[in-house]
Amino acid sequence: MNWKSVTLCIGLCLFAFIGKAQHAVKLNLKRTIQLANDSSLSAFRYQNMYLSGYWEYRTYKANRLPSLTMNLMPAQYYRYITQRYDSNTDMDVYREQQMFSASSGLSIRQNFDLTGGTFYIDSDLEYLRNFGDTRSTQFSSVPFRIGYSQSLLGYNPFRWDRKIEPLKFEKVKKEFIYHTEEVSEEAVNYFFNLAMAQADYQLAKENMASTDTLYSIGLQRHKIAAISRADLLTLQLDKVNARNTLENAQIALKRAMFALASFLNMDKHTQIELDMPGRPLAMEISVDEALARAKSNNPNFLQQQQHVLEAERDVNKTRVESRFNASLNASVGFNQVADNFKDAYRKPMQQDLVSVSVSIPLVDWGVRKGKHNMARNNLNVVKIAARQEELKLEEEVTMTVSDFNIQQRLIASAEEALDLAIMAYEQTRQRFIIGKADVNSLTLSLNRQQEAQKNYISALQNYWLNYYKIRKLTLHDFESSLSLSDRFDFNNGMYR
């Protein structure tokens, strides 16, 4: 490889590195939330959680449909010693016997949810060949058999599945939207953390430039004895502190930018510039409406309903199992046996089966009764927990909506305070330059401006955090008055 090639490779690598390091994007709040829901690792995790629940429900629905099964045993060889009667010696003797067999069958089954029984249709064919002293070949067929098996007094799982499984899937869908709004809430938090860091950094830069200018002015005024030595040292201290603040703000900015880039699954070298949202439109949310939406949409309510149903199912199961159990199996069909395959299906004979089995617990030392009492007590616990969760959620919705409605007024107040603080600082700075304001007044004015800037960004952050938290708790978009479920495509897991 010649030097030109080496130089070219190095140049390309440096170009790629510089291009990567200087990659920059500009994001507003809406775009940040979209990227979070499309690209973040949290969004991928929640999407796969939804798909897991989706396929679980599909499996439940498939189990309600007829199933067709083929059972095959292509070959079985069996060699053994058996006892046989020898007519020549009039005594039993042991003989070696060999057997080869094969079987196949088709079975159609359909569960019947109302009674918990199972309908079935079978068709079987078996082949048997014996070797040894006794040689024979037989085909046994069951061309057709239809039957029904049913637990007469037992637990019916199908009936409870019809109540629980659709509720579970509805909960999974609502959880998906809930977690999507949770990702949006996280995105808002990361966005404003970076916004606060950028504002701090910008203020630190301006403060650094301002303190440097003021210190230079102070030096000139000190030479003509316009300010004291103590005031000059204070200006110098402000300059040093401003430089330290700038360095700390730069570190905090890098951390906040890296955190947002990582959350959005971007390259860690991405430079992010934020477009801050302005004052949001005035919107008042009714606490009663938010509570009603939460009770009908929040997945935590559905989860508590699921827990209550599952506990009631366990009570029913243990109560039924504490008594005797009886089951019925009835079938009618045809069968035949012959030495060859064709005759095995010729003139089949009718085959009938009716069986009733009963299982009666006599002595179990209170095991069944104990299980039933445990299930009943657990049902009471679940109902109490469901009520506690309901009260907790009602409190959370009420407080969040109240904070949101107040936060809109706080944004207007914080914006007004920021404008006043900026004007006050500029006037104090000009008065200091012409010698009509002291250092303490200037420092106090600067601190007030910085505090007002932080309060304004914090007010915006709290507003949007509360807004998306309300969306998460209610699964409702109050801005467009639409349910978030109506805007969701559950097949693809994406907003429409």
List where the protein language model places each region:
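Amphipathic alpha-helical coiled-coil segments
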Residues: 45-60, 179, 183-204, 215, ...
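Bacterial Sec-dependent N-terminal signal peptides
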Residues: 1-27
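Residues that define the transmembrane beta-barrel architecture of outer-membrane proteins
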Residues: 98-104, 140-144, 348-352
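Amphipathic alpha-helical coiled-coil scaffold segments and their short linker/junction regions
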Residues: 33-37, 89-93, 227, 231-232, ...
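Transmembrane beta-strands of outer-membrane beta-barrel pores
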Residues: 74-78, 125-129, 152, 332-336, ...
